Amino acid sequence: MAEAAALEGSEPVDLTKHPSGIIPTLQNIVSTVNLDCKLDLKAIALQARNAEYNPKRFAAVIMRIREPKTTALIFASGKMVCTGAKSEQQSKLAARKYARIIQKLGFPAKFKDFKIQNIVASCDVKFPIRLEGLAYSHGAFSSYEPELFPGLIYRMRQPKIVLLIFVSGKIVLTGAKVREETYSAFENIYPVLTEFRKVQQ
């Protein structure tokens, strides 16, 4: 997993934290913040060039910035959701930028209760997996209906993370509030994945 190491700043993988030698890559961070003031969404949409507002479709202004590349949903209550950042710091930086845009439009926006709500990460174990066998022996945690969705959905209890496991060995992890939960969920599942490794004929 040289790519993961390169992304994390090119130091070698710390095997005490990541015994599998694989570090899941963060793909999307969802965060929320309270701007703590009522907002006139129509006025915001008219004044901000990176904003769209279609109240018949959705009761929020959708705003986008390029750096960090993110999308915000801004509600009249002053609540805001920020999605698309690739790290916690980037998510907070983006949320601050949106808050600043709202301030510049003349609203007394604050920055209260910033919170990471969901971290989505992915990785590749680089070997195929027997999903039927895994689903059968871990029935309490797994749902696998290949006609509906090609991946096995594994609901881990501790940490409370949902994993999508694909035959190819690609894994998506979602539901974490801190990245360590993502890492420990992956380390928990890794021995199970190796147990159900498909033997190539």
Swiss-Prot record:
Source species: Triticum aestivum (Wheat)
CDD domains (alphabetical): TBP_eukaryotes (cd04516)
PANTHER family in the record: TATA-BOX BINDING PROTEIN
Keyword entries, A-Z: DNA-binding, Nucleus, Repeat, Transcription
Single Gene Ontology BP annotation: DNA-templated transcription initiation
Highest taxon above the source species: Eukaryota
Subcellular location: Nucleus
The family this protein is said to belong to: Belongs to the TBP family.
Main location per the UniProt record: nucleus
GO molecular function, one term: RNA polymerase II general transcription initiation factor activity
Name the UniProt record assigns to this protein: TATA-box-binding protein 2
InterPro entries linked to this entry: TBP, TBP_CS, TBP_dom_sf, TBP_eukaryotic
SUPFAM superfamilies: TATA-box binding protein-like
